[in-house]
Design a protein with these regions (language model features):
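Residues that define the transmembrane beta-barrel architecture of outer-membrane proteins
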Residues: 42-46, 74-78, 92, 108-114, ...
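Repeated loop/turn-to-beta-strand initiation elements of outer-membrane beta-barrel proteins
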Residues: 22-24, 56-62, 90-96, 123-129, ...
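Short glycine/proline- and aromatic-enriched beta-strand/turn motifs that initiate or cap beta-hairpins
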Residues: 19-68
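Outer-membrane beta-barrel "beta-signal"
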Residues: 192-198, 215-227
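Detector for outer-membrane/organellar transmembrane beta-barrel domains
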Residues: 111-179
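Cleavable N-terminal export/targeting peptides
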Residues: 1-21
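Outer membrane beta-barrel transmembrane domains
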Residues: 166-206
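Transmembrane beta-strands of outer-membrane beta-barrel pores
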Residues: 28-34, 64-68, 86, 100-104, ...
């Protein structure tokens, strides 16, 4: 009994447990849009992610989504990302990461991409500017079998509204290379939306568009649960 009492007292005075470096989320989207282009043919998709963040700035992410079968890439996508983020000034951070895109049904479509992002956070507002680059590799061949590279520059921002749990978001990007629309001199994409968050649940409604020849603009709804 004394041992039990001592354990109870020690428990009362113990320091709070440290926050876990792991987090996760699951989502249902009405249309899986990547850089403005639908990869689910306008149909709903299921998505999930597992995240790791270390106080040193190192982070890793495992993300997956269902797809509509496009060519030989199959019905699923798995992305593995690792990176490092560092604050370089008050409210200003720099992130460097690398992502490997896997399509389990076709290993020949797998490819790698690096991304550098600069983010500024001031009060309820945040803004980011980034560049993603995929070097020439087998999955990025053109119709003549030549390996090509791909570049994507993007900006995005958000502002939380006062007194209500709503955030307004916007983004724009320009892509040139293996995934662009050459006849248009590159591909532009953009989005404007809002997010409502309450506890672990988040609802989002976003208007997404692009200059891609395939597809059209769409209003995309998302329901996300985080833990």
């Amino acid at each position: 009994m004394r041992l039990l009492a001592a354990a109870m007292i020690a428990g009362c005075w113990a320091a709070p447990a440290a926050a876990s470096p792991f987090s996760g989320e699951a989502a249902l989207v009405s249309d899986y849009r990547y850089r403005g282009v639908s990869l689910s043919d306008g149909n709903p998709a299921l998505q999930a992610a597992l995240n790791f963040e270390h106080p040193s700035g190192f982070h890793a992410n495992l993300w997956t989504s269902t797809l509509r079968r496009i060519g030989s890439i199959g019905h699923s996508e798995i992305d593995v990302t690792a990176g490092y983020e560092r604050e370089i000034a008050k409210g200003l951070s720099f992130d460097l990461s690398a992502t490997r895109y896997f399509y389990p049904s076709s290993g020949s479509e797998n490819y790698s991409e690096g991304t550098a992002t600069l983010t500024l956070e001031q009060g309820a507002a945040s803004a980011s500017l980034g560049l993603s680059y995929a070097p020439p590799q087998r999955a990025l061949c053109d119709g003549l079998g030549r390996r090509r590279d791909n570049g994507y520059i993007f900006g995005q921002g958000g502002i939380a509204l006062p007194r209500i749990p709503v955030t307004i978001t916007a983004s724009a990007g320009y892509e040139r290379g293996a995934f662009d629309e050459v006849r248009n001199g590159g591909k532009w994409d953009w989005s404007l939306g809002g997010e409502f968050e309450r506890g672990p649940a988040k609802l989002a409604l976003t208007y997404v568009g692009s200059t891609a020849d395939s597809g059209s603009d769409a209003l995309v709804g998302t329901v996300t649960l985080s833990w």
